Swiss-Prot record:
Record's function text: Ligates lysine onto the cytidine present at position 34 of the AUA codon-specific tRNA(Ile) that contains the anticodon CAU, in an ATP-dependent manner. Cytidine is converted to lysidine, thus changing the amino acid specificity of the tRNA from methionine to isoleucine.
Listed name of the protein: tRNA(Ile)-lysidine synthase
Gene: tilS
Transmembrane segments: none
HAMAP family recorded: tRNA_Ile_lys_synt
GO biological process: tRNA modification
């Protein structure tokens, strides 16, 4: 544990004061108050999440106190602020000590706490660190969703920092990610229909958060497994990013800017993709139908050859059709986990291939695989493309 005392009153130390301003500028404000929406805060006990719950607790406390017309101090109602801690149990007593530490903070701040104990996985505490980062993230995500619904929370606040953003984007880049991955972590994203994940510290450096905690004497826990470079994220954090920063000191800020610009581009493509879905497709049950006649009339061969005709050419652009297809997958609840960029490009090629459009009632899903890759209408997750009455139909088998 880093530090040795807990703060008892709001602190005006320079770094902490800047962090308080930062949280106010990024947290949603409804009618002049940020504390009107019930919020669940994820806290591991590490520095970033400890800083987040302390900052939000101060914000809630400030907004709960005010003056009435007689200039008397009164307490104003605020929405619930709930802390959630997921105990994976992977580090034995250390994991339990993390839980006890988070409970201590919540007791001092008088915040309700909900804890999830994860059942033992196939990787026990004695068999070394768990390397399946995706599984651990999904466990936490599912827990946060359940806890938010249980406590009526609209927002789930998590403590991703600017360093997390840079590490994520580098990880995505070396894996050959698409445009969505190059945008990195979003400041807000949907967890469920009525639940939004918010990341108010996404523009704050990790060292800045630690400096602020030191100024106010607030301790935090250090997870020894964060040093294990068996985790790709830790390898990027401890080896790759420091090497980059040794040559480019402002690399984290530059990567963050690049992600912001990519996000803006993605939003433009998404809007075009939604227009494409509305104009050329229909959904019925587990079927997605692409009306080729509509697409053909809007993008004739003459218009396709005219590069200056941007009003029509966007309809056949691969990024737009890929984005539209991904939206369709999400709308139908189909998993995109095994869909690679090669799959999306193949689907786009079939959609744009007019020779497929005029193949009457022939299932194009019976193609042969070449070099282990199906070049026809079969896609991961049991999704099949066929031609029915000159329409392209995708369905779950």
């Amino acid at each position: 544990m880093i530090g040795d005392v807990l703060p008892t009153t709001p602190n005006e130390s320079p770094n902490w004061h800047r962090l308080r301003r930062a949280i106010r500028s990024t947290w949603p404000n409804r009618h002049g108050r940020s504390s009107d929406v019930a919020t669940l805060v994820g806290c591991s006990g590490g520095a970033d999440s400890v800083a987040l719950i302390c900052l939000l607790a101060e914000l809630w406390a400030e907004e709960s106190n005010g003056l009435n017309p007689a200039n008397e101090t009164v307490t104003k109602p605020v929405a619930p602020l709930v802390v959630a801690h997921c105990n994976h149990g992977l580090r034995g007593e250390e994991s339990n000590a993390d839980e006890a530490f988070v409970r201590q903070i919540c007791d001092q701040l008088q915040l309700p706490l909900v804890i999830h104990h994860v059942p033992p996985l196939n990787n026990s505490a004695t068999s070394g660190p768990v390397s399946d980062e995706r599984t651990l993230r999904q466990i936490r995500r599912d827990f946060f969703e359940r806890a938010a619904k249980q406590h009526g929370c609209r927002y789930v606040a998590v403590a991703h920092s600017a360093d997390d953003q840079a590490e994520t984007m580098l990880h995505h880049f070396i894996r050959g990610t698409g445009p969505l991955g190059l945008a990195g972590i979003a400041e807000a994203s949907e967890l469920d229909t009525d639940i939004v994940v918010r990341r108010p510290l996404l523009q704050v450096r990790r060292d800045t958060l630690r400096d602020g905690l030191r100024e106010i004497g607030q301790p935090w826990r250090e997870d020894a497994s964060n040093r294990h470079t068996i985790y790709t994220r830790n390898w990027i954090r401890h080896d790759v990013l420091p090497l980059i920063e040794s040559r480019y000191p402002n690399a984290v800020e530059a990567i963050h800017r690049a992600g912001t610009l990519q996000h803006e581009m993605n939003e433009m493509v998404r809007r075009l993709a939604e227009r494409w879905l509305e104009a050329f497709t229909d959904f019925s049950g587990d079927r997605w139908t692409i009306h080729t006649e509509r697409l053909s009339k809007s993008a004739t061969p003459e218009k396709r050859m005219d590069d200056t005709n941007a009003a029509c050419s966007w309809m056949i652009e691969r990024p737009v059709i890929v984005a539209a297809s991904q939206l369709a997958w999400d709308r139908l609840g189909w998993s995109r986990g095994s869909m690679t960029m090669q799959h999306w490009q193949r689907l786009t090629g079939l959609i744009n291939d007019q020779s497929c459009w005029h193949t009457s009632d022939i299932d194009v899903s019976t193609s042969q695989a070449v070099d282990g890759i199906d070049h026809g209408g079969h896609f991961p997750g049991g999704i099949c493309l066929s031609v029915e009455a000159k329409q392209l139909v995708l369905r779950s088998e």
